[in-house]
């Protein structure tokens, strides 16, 4: 193996250098503080767990199982998984480790690992930050979570030009149930909706039970008024469909009231991981970026695998994506070598003010210190900081 080969990193992973690492860490700290004052308590979860725990969502979210790295535990011989998402771990905490009665709010930040990138040009080792609310199945809880997500993105990135998409899997799911479709028909419809293939959708729904309703769902996915006008009276009377539609309307109205300058849209056939989500879904997008800045939704019953099914809603984002193309201007104060008490006190005082101070070692000079922008100099018996 040549020396150059030892420099190579696997596809989809990268070093984060000081100019950007400083930005990322600032985002992380500010985000955790933002969530903390809203009642979201920080938890740390292990990087590895037995695969049975991490795969607690595998039946409802097979994508998660596919992106989870698996290794053999050298101590027990059991199969371990490297976390690809922290939500199953927080669900375990809520269900078993810290079974709070009533509403529980958690937040987290840490590296997760994926077997393959989740979208174009994405890292396989995102720095995932998220917040979750357990124990309340109300619209108010959903609105709170969307509101918190938007506030966090506004602080960490910007909402200027951003677009919020709202959807509700209950519309599609209740229509499928009402029509009595087979699993194959359900999967085919989901694929057509995801591809926005209206001509194919029109052809496929011609001989489908409730076909005109399924076509209307795709054709008028972004206009609730037009959608209602083209749906049959039968499905509009269905209790589950009506509840989902009203929940989406109410959420849309409340979010628009809270964020009047934000561009908010509807997409009732945005069915990413619809087997995993159980209600409202939301994602916020920035201009000229295909992947969402943050996304989330309702996933009731997530703790059932751990013996305690509870209502739950939450969102997550990748701090690396939020900090992309942002670079800190690093400033460093260079102090001369020496052990004099007044010099050491001057260095300590500067550091207490939040300044980065590096003291020269041995034969070092200014040229040996990266990012040297200022120096500590002795003038008339006083140590002063001067720009280089």
UniProtKB/Swiss-Prot annotation:
Stored Gene3D superfamilies: Bira Bifunctional Protein, Domain 2 (3.30.930.10)
Domain of life of the native organism: Bacteria
One Pfam family matching this protein: tRNA-synt_His
GO CC annotation terms, alphabetical: cytoplasm
Any single GO BP term: L-histidine biosynthetic process
Location of this chain's protein in the cell: Cytoplasm
Keyword entries, A-Z: Amino-acid biosynthesis, Cytoplasm, Histidine biosynthesis
Pathway: Amino-acid biosynthesis; L-histidine biosynthesis; L-histidine from 5-phospho-alpha-D-ribose 1-diphosphate: step 1/9
UniProt function note: Required for the first step of histidine biosynthesis. May allow the feedback regulation of ATP phosphoribosyltransferase activity by histidine.
Entries under NCBIfam families matching the protein: PRK12292.1-1, PRK12421.1
Subunit structure of this chain's protein: Heteromultimer composed of HisG and HisZ subunits.
Misc. remarks from the entry: This function is generally fulfilled by the C-terminal part of HisG, which is missing in some bacteria such as this one.
Family: Belongs to the class-II aminoacyl-tRNA synthetase family. HisZ subfamily.
HAMAP family the UniProt entry points to: HisZ (MF_00125)
This protein's name: ATP phosphoribosyltransferase regulatory subunit
């Amino acid at each position: 193996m040549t020396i150059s080969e030892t420099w190579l990193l696997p596809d989809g992973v990268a070093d984060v250098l000081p100019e950007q690492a400083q930005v990322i860490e600032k985002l992380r700290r500010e985000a955790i503080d933002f969530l903390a004052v809203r009642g979201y308590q920080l938890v740390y979860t292990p990087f590895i767990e037995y695969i049975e725990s991490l795969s607690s969502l595998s039946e409802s979210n097979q994508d998660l199982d596919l992106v989870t790295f698996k290794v053999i535990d050298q101590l027990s011989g059991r199969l371990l998984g490297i976390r690809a998402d922290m939500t199953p771990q927080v669900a375990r905490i809520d269900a078993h480790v810290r079974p709070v009665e009533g509403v529980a709010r958690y937040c987290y930040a840490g590296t997760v690992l994926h077997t393959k990138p989740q979208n174009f040009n994405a890292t396989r080792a995102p720095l995932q930050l998220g917040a979750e609310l357990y124990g309340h199945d109300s619209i108010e809880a959903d609105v709170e979570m969307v509101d918190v997500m938007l506030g966090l993105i506004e602080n960490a990135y910007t909402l200027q030009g951003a677009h919020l998409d709202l959807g509700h899997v209950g519309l599609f799911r209740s229509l499928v149930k009402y029509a009595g479709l087979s699993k194959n028909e359900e999967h085919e419809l989901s694929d057509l909706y995801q591809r926005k293939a209206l001509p194919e959708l029109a052809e496929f729904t011609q001989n489908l039970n409730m076909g005109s309703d399924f076509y209307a769902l795709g054709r008028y996915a972004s206009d609730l008024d037009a959608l209602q006008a083209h749906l049959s009276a039968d499905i509009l009377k269905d209790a589950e469909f009506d509840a989902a539609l009203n929940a989406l309307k109410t959420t849309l109205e409340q979010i628009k009231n809270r964020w009047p300058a934000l561009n908010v849209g509807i997409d009732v056939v945005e069915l990413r991981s619809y087997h995993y989500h159980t209600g409202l879904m939301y994602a916020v997008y920035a201009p000229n970026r295909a992947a969402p800045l943050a996304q989330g939704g309702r996933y009731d019953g997530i703790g059932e695998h751990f013996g305690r099914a509870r209502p739950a809603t939450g969102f997550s984002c990748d701090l690396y994506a939020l900090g992309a193309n942002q670079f800190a201007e690093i400033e460093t104060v260079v102090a001369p070598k020496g052990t004099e008490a007044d010099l050491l006190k001057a260095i300590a005082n500067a550091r207490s003010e939040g300044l980065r101070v590096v003291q020269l070692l041995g034969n070092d000079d200014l040229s040996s210190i990266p990012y040297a922008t200022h120096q500590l100099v002795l003038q008339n018996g006083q140590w002063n900081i001067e720009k280089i």
